[in-house]
């Protein structure tokens, strides 16, 4: 399938999102679509698949002008879109999720479970994934849910698959499996639009790259004809001299200390400490127990045994409000479900953990609240027309900034960041890193969980590595390398 989008314009109200964008997808190619959050990448693909109607411009498929009325029609015509926000029904089984809306029936009109199971098993095996078809999708890891989405798209016999941040929650092994599937699809003439902020992946798996900025097409190039620095410059319109800002740590006293922390079947006897002004990175493979440990420290899933000390005093953290009272903030890996109330305003989201400070007499002082929110929006350079804009309508990078603003507002002693830049563009990543430096300069102790090794190496003063629920090693900034971390993460010494 050959797709040609030419001179595309699209506005939402007064907001001009796309201005004269052109994009071409050739048969059997993997084409990267890159740009900062808000550049218009997802909007362009939503126009292609019929979710939105374009204002002007043309879309040609195999030389014929074609416009779909909705995504289902696009799917029926061979174009599947795997969104960054997974379209998973958590209470339904893996099998039901794979066939929802396109169930197979026998000649008598009954559901043909036998055939559906066989097809589902075949597709998951093709992806190299082992998941019980009877398991509820909500009980699957985020990585497994992502694989279910990919399998669902492949089962439609799509000729074009749009993948929006497909590896954001996948392990290294799962990424390699996905790349193997992409290469096989490519050989069979399937075209892939690959939307990602992970530059290493783009240069590994893609044939061409189109860069967008501020709703316009900047350039399209073959991967061998460009490099990381050129792409970043075209994305942000400026040089990013260093990927990670320089750190000059000056650690103070121990603020957070965890001793012999255990949760049955998840992690065992983990001890570590974090000092004021320090960033401690926590690395390990998906499923190692990193996030679960942080959730326990924050009181979301309390420890079975072990102790937590804040500034030398034992703290009973049985629920998140206990942690907040002790000065702990937690930015979760899943900002959409746990970090934000999507259908409320930026103002309400930022103010939420801080309501007590605006309500000394039992009612909210609206003026104080607004001044507080405006200050944080300005400080974190959150791009929005109004504090009353719903969080759902922000780009990924700006949503993450709102989550960070929410917790900065409590004046934390300890800030836990779980995958702080997942799904965030290069420019916004650097802003988040600079903010982390500002916080540590003010004495905040930061614990950062990340699956991106360059991020761990670029921002951590110390690195803790977790393997299968145990602390397998601790490395200083000078001793930490990708090879050393991966050795410890896979059980080596």
UniProtKB/Swiss-Prot annotation:
GO cellular component, as recorded: plasma membrane
**Gene Ontology MF annotations:** ABC-type D-ribose transporter activity; ATP binding; ATP hydrolysis activity
Give the matching CDD domains: ABC_Carb_Monos_I, ABC_Carb_Monos_II
Per UniProt, subcellular location reads as: Cell membrane
Membrane topology field: Peripheral membrane protein
Q: What class of enzyme is it?
A: translocase
Domain named ABC transporter: residues: 3-239, 252-493
Report the protein name in the record.
Ribose import ATP-binding protein RbsA
State the species of origin.
Bacillus licheniformis (strain ATCC 14580 / DSM 13 / JCM 2505 / CCUG 7422 / NBRC 12200 / NCIMB 9375 / NCTC 10341 / NRRL NRS-1264 / Gibson 46)
Q: What is the lineage of its organism?
A: Bacteria, Bacillati, Bacillota, Bacilli, Bacillales
Annotated gene:
rbsA
